Amino acid sequence: MTEKKPMIQALQAVRGMNDILPDEAEAWEHFEDIVRDWLRSYGYRPIRMPIVEPTPLFKRAIGEVTDIVEKEMYSFEDALNGEQLTLRPEGTASCVRAAIQHKMLSAGAQRLYYHGPMFRHERPQKGRYRQFHQIGVEALGFDGPDIDAEHILMCARLWDDFGLEDVRLELNSLGSSDERARHRAELVAYLERHRERLDDDGRRRLHTNPLRILDTKNPELQDLVDNAPKLLDFLGEDSLKHFNGVQVLLKDAGVPYRINHRLVRGLDYYNRTVFEWVTTRLGAQGTVCAGGRYDGLVEQLGGRPAPAAGFAMGIERLLALWRESGGEAEPAQPDVYVVHLGEQAQRLAFRAAEALRSHGFAVLMHCGGGSFKSQMKKADASGAPVAVVIGDDEAATGEVGLKPLRGPGGQQRVALDGLANAVAECLFTENEEEDGSL
């Protein structure tokens, strides 16, 4: 009796890190194509950074006493040299590090963008993943309110391009480090007077990162933080002028916004303008896009002092919002499906397929054998409007059969050197019929 082999256990993806299967991946590519065109229309250029960075980069940039650094980073020791490494939790620090390392600012101010996976060790839930994807935009070397306004207007245009509704802009200014220090002292004194009302998280942050208490989601603390000292009241002349300059440009462009005194962002490197685009259409996790200025970060990471601003948006959330608003990507379909039967027919089929691809057609070549009937079923299912059919008779004469699959008309014989023109004519005729031109 043959001994039964034990079942090999199938492995699964890590929880919170999702496979993006072909139907979904096509929607992502359609979305990313639109985004790339949008970014280029504003003069932004692509940059690609490593997924793994030295851990001190994020500790220095994001801040030691932040949720990201304290709780959420995937960090490990390099077994070869003992270096502490981290899967990037965000892109700004990496982009600034690259700009410093390669002396990019010596050539002048830079408008840059990137997109790709980021990693945070969070509890997976709707709209939150351990591996998620971001589009990041960074403008290095620009110090005026105009670049802040440009970033916000860029987002407004993208929402319009995608037909997104119910996305609202919230705005605040964090001022300079000196202004934040004065506000911090008043804020800590205020919170100390109400220490008994703070939750465990608030008491922990009281003397390490009190600004983050203003961003609490605890409903029992809402009236406490609503009455806390407002950073806007501590801004000096320069910070107020900068913030007013942003608002003037937004009003000129007709972009509505709400000043949110509790908007502080979760990363330590921000100063002056900060903003978020939020929606109620994605449940509790309603931030679609966020950004602001980080004028001290270049120097903080070892570069010469340089102003900077940027923003990032989550691709998963944007796609969900786009679909919620009725957005849909058309599935990719070939122009031509090639059917063949017999060895000589197969050889001619490969030549025909490559000839069509040389003329820019998308061609799906049947592989795996089967009868003409079964192959034609697959041709119909592929969505291709035209089939190239090759059997022994066609192979013997060096010709191919051309059969419309969607419109009227029967199969015709075409010489190989005239195939591209014949396919183009078939596709043109079909498009005219779909448009109602005939």
UniProtKB/Swiss-Prot annotation:
> Any idea of its EC number?
6.1.1.21
Gene Ontology biological-process entries: histidyl-tRNA aminoacylation
Q: Where in the cell is it found?
A: Cytoplasm
Catalyses which reaction(s): tRNA(His) + L-histidine + ATP = L-histidyl-tRNA(His) + AMP + diphosphate + H(+)
Is Mitochondrion a UniProt keyword of this protein? Answer: no
SUPFAM superfamilies, alphabetized: Class II aaRS ABD-related (SSF52954), Class II aaRS and biotin synthetases (SSF55681)
Q: From which domain of life does this come?
A: Bacteria
Q: Which UniProt keywords apply?
A: Aminoacyl-tRNA synthetase, ATP-binding, Cytoplasm, Ligase, Nucleotide-binding, Protein biosynthesis
Which residues pair up as cystines? Answer: none
Gene Ontology CC entries for this record: cytoplasm
Transmembrane ranges, per UniProt, are: none
Q: Does the keyword Zinc-finger apply?
A: no
Give GO terms: molecular function aspect only. Answer: ATP binding; histidine-tRNA ligase activity
Record's subunit section: Homodimer.
Name the family the entry cites: Belongs to the class-II aminoacyl-tRNA synthetase family.
Q: What is this protein called?
A: Histidine--tRNA ligase
Q: Which gene encodes it?
A: hisS
